[in-house]
Each structure stands twice: as structure tokens, then as C-alpha cells.
Amino acid sequence: MSQKTPSPPGELKRDIRALKGASKVARIPVKVEPTTERQRKPHWIRAKAPIGPEVLRLKGLLREHRLHTVCEEASCPNLGECFGHGTATFLIMGNICTRRCPFCDVAHGRPDPLDAEEPMHLAQAIGAMGLRHVVVTSVDRDDLRDGGAAHFTHCIQAIRTQSPQTRIEVLVPDFRGRMDRALEALTAGPPDIFNHNLETVPRLYKAVRPGADYLWSLRLLARFKEDHPTVPTKSGLMLGLGEELAEVEQVMKDLRDHGCDMLTLGQYLQPSLYHLPVRRFVTPEEFDGLGDKAREMGFTHVASGPMVRSSYHADRQAAGESVV
């Protein structure tokens, strides 16, 4: 049977745009009122423009291997910097999510079937880039019996075969209702770092993470740690959505109580006027203070700063270097 030719990038982008923004957040429990204009950012929020020869080279390589990155699909403000250094966070299992989180710019809809060749294409691209540390994440796939955990494992195994020296970090969804099956699938090829983001404080979950559960996410981190005690676990929070600093500190404590080793704290930025607004811009000094408290609590690796994202300079995070 002949293989279906992928849609040209322009056509794919037009289709995806219809699944973002207003249409995505139209049916969530807590209604998001569109803002009328972009908020002015403080001077400490600066991002590199996504242009330059290395950015174009990496985009070409990704299209050649029919791969997506969360950098592009989620409109990450650090895309220009990361692509400019030849690094990317790979987004597997397509670029259409089964969830409607109003902080995220990834499209919502009915996902395509899994691509059985994606692990091979992913491993080839990573080999071509010569990456020493790679981050692999995914959309939520509530349509799959294991939430896509086996596909994660296939990708990890393919990368290890192609690039045995590459350190593999996975940023996984919550595998809602499928934790046992997902964790069992991951035992066949555990990563070097297991990351699952809590994203925000429990009080804001209904508005920020509709369909997710704070305690479930904590249990996922703890259960993986029980199964793989030598593999570091990691989580992250976005700040500026209306949380109190005391609530953030309590989440940090909850993470430590559930065996989490690594932590990222960054500023939430509104992807579009239809997404959740920024309630406030947390100062660099506040990020520094939270980072100090996290280290006092026993986190082995902490990245805390306005432009920090879960996978921002993940190689340096894993090495224990300061990332802000």
C-alpha cells in the first residue's frame, strides 16, 4: 500500500489554526473572556526573534523527518534562542491535543492515528543533530488505551539504538484514567529523566487545567519514582495566573513529599488574546527567592526565572547549571 503523502506545511498550518484560539477554549468549564489588546511586558521579559540560518536549518530538518516541536506548536517565546543553538523539544503523537487547556496554544481536536514510523524518524533527526540531551513530549491522547505511553517507549528505544550516548528526558501528560497501563508500558524503556508538569496551584486547576487533577498528577510522579527510584523526576509551574506565593511554596512541598527531584518555575505568557490573561508579572527577585526556597527543600536541580520553561536549556538544567 502506498504511503499517504504528508500535507504541505502551509496546508497543515491552515488546518491547525482553525483548532486553536477562540474555537479551542469555547467549551471549557470556566469561560475565558478574550482580552482586547496585548499586555505590555516588563523589561525583564525578552525573547529572541525566531530568525536566522540555524533556525531555518532546524525547521527544514524537522519537516524532512515529518516531526513536530512543542516550541512551534505551543508558540514558545524561547523558540528563536533554542533553535538558534540547535536544540528543540520534540512533540510526538501529532500536533492535535484531546484537551482544551486555556493556557496552551497547541490545537485541540480529534488526533490522527499514531505514525508507526515516528520513532524511527525521531531517532534519525536526533542522530543528525548530534544532540547529547533530548526532550520528548506529547499532546494528550485520551483516545488511546494507554494514553500513548507505549509510543513514548518505542521512541525512547529507537533513540537509544541510534544515539546510545544521548540523555533522554520525557515530559509526559497525566495519562488520566490510564496510570497503571501507562506505567507498565514505560517499564520496557524508562527515560533518563521523567517530567510531568503540575502547571499551577490546586486552587486554579478548574480554570487552568480543565480535565486534570492535582492529586492524580502528584501520584503519577510518585508512582513512577517507586518503579524507577534511580531515575530523577521533574515538574514545573507557570506563575502569574493568580496564585499566591504561599500556594506555590505549598506545591513545592507537595512535590518533595512525592519524591520529585527537579523543579522549574517560569512566567506564564498569554499565547493569544483568547487565552487566559496574565494576572501579574512575577519579578526576577521573586523567582530568585522561590528558587532559594526550593533548594532548601531539597530539590537537586532548580531553574527559576521569568523565561524558564520546563525544557528550556534542559541539558544545562540536568547538569545543575544556573538557568534563568
Curated annotation (Swiss-Prot):
[4Fe-4S] cluster 2 binds at C97, C101, C104. One of its GO terms (molecular function) is lipoate synthase activity. Its main location: cytoplasm. [4Fe-4S] cluster 1 binds at C71, C76, C82, S311. Its cofactor is [4Fe-4S] cluster. The keyword Cytoplasm applies. Residues 83-300 form the Radical SAM core domain. It is found in: Cytoplasm. Its EC number is 2.8.1.8. It comes from the Bacteria. It catalyses: [[Fe-S] cluster scaffold protein carrying a second [4Fe-4S](2+) cluster] + N(6)-octanoyl-L-lysyl-[protein] + 2 oxidized [2Fe-2S]-[ferredoxin] + 2 S-adenosyl-L-methionine + 4 H(+) = [[Fe-S] cluster scaffold protein] + N(6)-[(R)-dihydrolipoyl]-L-lysyl-[protein] + 4 Fe(3+) + 2 hydrogen sulfide + 2 5'-deoxyadenosine + 2 L-methionine + 2 reduced [2Fe-2S]-[ferredoxin]. Binds 2 [4Fe-4S] clusters per subunit. One cluster is coordinated with 3 cysteines and an exchangeable S-adenosyl-L-methionine. GO terms for cellular component: cytoplasm. Pathway: Protein modification; protein lipoylation via endogenous pathway; protein N(6)-(lipoyl)lysine from octanoyl-[acyl-carrier-protein]: step 2/2. Keywords: 4Fe-4S, Cytoplasm, Iron, Iron-sulfur, Metal-binding, S-adenosyl-L-methionine, Transferase. PANTHER family: LIPOYL SYNTHASE, LIPOYL SYNTHASE, MITOCHONDRIAL. Belongs to the radical SAM superfamily. Lipoyl synthase family. This is Lipoyl synthase.
